[in-house]
A protein has these predicted regions:
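C-terminal segment of N-terminal export signals and the immediately downstream linker at the start
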Residues: 26-50
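Short, polar/charged alpha-helical segment
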Residues: 39-48, 55, 60-82, 175
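A ligand-binding cleft/hinge motif common to bilobed small-molecule-binding domains
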Residues: 122-124, 289-307
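Mature extracytoplasmic/periplasmic domains
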Residues: 318-319, 323-391
């Protein structure tokens, strides 16, 4: 899943950059580097012998290992491209881009080729002209396997993608319990049974205080269950929301959240500060349910959670989002970046990510060959993992970036201690 270090919480205001970039004309069309974007063979040939730098949050050792041991050798063998993986906080990446543009290092004079990015970071970088494109529509694997019109691909937390980034992976909220304590028929499936579960286990359920991105996602799942997917997803494209508009949509959901309070930890008068605290409370047995972006299979494998851990999503759905890859406007190796991104989107590498990391693929499963689809279906899952199609069928688009702080304010005004 996409780390919180690369989430909407990492948004950076790059003061003065918009004027600078607009003046320099940094938003370059995808065929402006002298290659016909329709001639993929020419792009591949131009990329040969390049060293391409992929920047992004580097805190996931399993992801880093997969890239260096699987993707990098593949790029070298197939295309003679050397992949350099650079771990860096997204704030520092955008600051580095800003500094390069202010120093006049535009077009192909930068140090960053492509970036792992999403949310407000993408919105900021795109608005300031730090991203090159549109390019995604020219990638063969996008053309063949990605539904670019799907809302969770075409919009990145409400910002139109418009070909300035290509999808990398998806993250979706999942709940889990210890199956040795909670029978299958007692697992919540919707807001009504979630309330009953809290009543049956008073004081042993809670969620992080919204403001923590997991806490906001949990209340979003429950609000969406109350409101219905269609009504909740209005928040996914509301790019200039007023508080009154958001309140009108989420009012029944907030009423429901208040109804949970008497049965929550501390009677809902206070909430844990963050998801790390909640995870520890669950591991210590203080709570009977936990949740997060993606299943806790790694914790089960490492002995931190029991092998009886069982994950689930609500029948009414759980929220999720997509993370992406974008090319810097001043990338020195744009062709190599395109080839590398295209390889990441190959069915084979997406399958490898699913097998190794449990990452939800961004490929449209219905567009895969029978052989590739069967390979995804045949992946052996751990005890705490859910089948890919179960998650995809229950996915709900998250509220867009500008809505999030409004939603959190409404929760703070209307729910704790009420």
């Amino acid at each position: 899943m996409l780390s919180s270090k690369l989430s909407r919480r990492s948004f950076v205001q790059l003061a003065g950059a918009a004027t600078l970039v607009a003046a320099s004309g940094a938003a370059i069309p995808s065929n402006a580097f002298g290659k016909d974007a329709a001639d993929w063979d020419a792009i591949v040939e131009a990329a040969r012998g390049s060293k391409v730098a992929w920047y992004g949050w580097g805190g996931s050792a399993p992801r880093n290992e997969l890239i260096t041991k699987t993707l990098a050798p593949r790029l070298k063998e197939k295309y003679d491209i050397e992949l350099e993986l650079v771990g860096m906080d997204i704030n520092n990446i955008l600051t580095q881009l800003s500094g390069e543009f202010q120093a006049g290092l535009t077009e192909d004079g930068g140090s960053i080729d492509f970036i792992w990015i999403n949310g407000e970071n993408f919105a900021s970088a795109k608005a300031n002209g730090y991203l090159w494109g549109p390019f995604a529509q020219d990638l063969p694997n996008v053309q063949d396997y990605v539904d670019t019109e799907a809302a969770d691909i075409a919009y990145d937390f409400g910002t139109p993608v418009e070909g300035y980034e290509a999808p990398y992976g998806k993250a979706q909220m999942v709940f889990w319990v210890d199956g040795a304590q909670i029978p299958q028929n007692e697992t919540p499936i919707d807001p009504e049974t979630f309330l009953q579960f809290c009543q049956d286990h008073p004081g042993m359920v809670t969620y992080p205080e919204p403001g923590d991105f997991t806490g906001t996602a949990i209340i979003s799942c429950l609000i969406a269950g109350v409101e219905g997917k269609e009504e909740f997803e209005k928040l996914a494209t509301m790019t200039e929301p007023s508080e009154d508009e958001v309140r009108a949509i989420v009012a029944p959901g907030m009423e429901y959240l208040r109804s949970l309070n008497p049965y929550l930890w501390k009677q809902g008068k206070t909430f844990p500060a963050d998801s790390t605290t909640v995870h520890q409370m669950y591991a210590d047995g203080e709570l009977i349910m936990d949740a997060g972006y993606g299943e806790p299979q790694t914790d089960v494998d490492n002995g931190l959670l029991p092998a009886t851990t069982r994950s689930f999503v609500l029948d009414t759905g759980t929220v999720g989002n997509t993370n992406y890859m974008a090319i810097a406007a001043n990338a020195p190796h744009k062709e190599a970046a395109m080839v590398a991104i295209n390889e990441v989107l190959s069915p084979d590498y997406q399958l490898t990510r699913y097998k190794t990391l449990g990452s939800i693929t961004v490929l449209d499963l219905d567009r895969l060959s029978e052989e590739d689809r069967a390979a995804f279906d045949a992946v052996e899952l751990g005890c705490a993992q859910l089948p890919l199609d179960v998650k995809l069928e229950h996915a709900i688009a998250e509220a867009c970036g500008p809505v999030i702080p409004v939603l959190e304010k409404i929760w703070h005004d209307e729910v704790p201690g009420k």
